[in-house]
């Protein structure tokens, strides 16, 4: 006569040690055990999938890539929102908070001296600043306050 394997020797790949069940011969225990088994069998069961190392690595890389791809834009958006809430009082670095920069062509004089040769010189009004000697700061647009990184204007090519 064939007998079923003892429940105390039941082994599972998901359990580190053999399942140890109390050895009660009462009908209460066997009835409870059969109810639990019946309940377990009534739900869909996920069985272990045999995955090789390359598949596991590929899945991990895919999940991490998606997480990073979503996480970076979310991080930038929160930084922009937080920066907009903070007051910006840092003076502009190029113009030291004045809002104007000295003209690079005439060095702030408003006129350009050109040596024609033979000892002759000609003084003319600066074509860059129109004789004003200074220009509006291109970094802060004349406000004197250093713009935040994402608020800086983009310079377009003159093509």
UniProtKB/Swiss-Prot annotation:
Membrane topology, from the record: Single-pass membrane protein
InterPro entries registered for this protein in UniProt: DUF5351, HSP_DnaJ_Cys-rich_dom_sf
Residues annotated as transit peptide in the record: 1-47
Assigned keywords, A-Z: Chloroplast, Membrane, Plastid, Repeat, Thylakoid, Transit peptide, Transmembrane, Transmembrane helix
GO MF, one annotated term: protein disulfide isomerase activity
Top-level taxon of the source organism: Eukaryota
Gene Ontology annotations for the cellular component aspect, listed alphabetically: chloroplast; chloroplast thylakoid membrane
Primary location group: plastid
Tissue: Expressed in source leaves. Lower levels of expression in fruits and stems.
Region feature (CR-type-like): 85-145
GO BP: photosystem II repair
Other comments on record: Its sequence is related to the DnaJ family but lacks the J domain. The CR-type-like region is similar to CR-type zinc-fingers and was shown to bind zinc.
Protein name, UniProt field: Protein SPA, chloroplastic
Source organism of the structure: Solanum lycopersicum (Tomato)
């Amino acid at each position: 006569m064939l007998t079923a394997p003892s429940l105390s020797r039941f082994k599972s790949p998901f359990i580190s040690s053999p399942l140890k069940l109390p050895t009660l011969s009462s009908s209460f225990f066997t009835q409870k055990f059969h109810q639990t088994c019946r309940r377990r069998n009534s739900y869909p069961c996920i069985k272990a999938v045999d995955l090789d190392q390359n598949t596991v690595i590929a899945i991990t890389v895919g999940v991490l890539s998606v997480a990073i791809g979503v996480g970076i834009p979310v991080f930038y958006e929160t930084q922009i929102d937080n920066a907009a809430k903070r007051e910006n009082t840092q003076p502009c670095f190029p113009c030291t908070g004045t809002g104007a920069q000295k003209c690079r062509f005439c060095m702030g004089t408003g006129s350009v001296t050109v040596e024609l040769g033979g000892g002759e010189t000609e003084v003319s009004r600066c074509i860059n600043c129109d004789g004003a000697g200074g220009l509006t700061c291109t970094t802060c647009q004349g406000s004197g306050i250093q713009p935040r990184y994402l608020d800086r204007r983009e310079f377009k090519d003159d093509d």
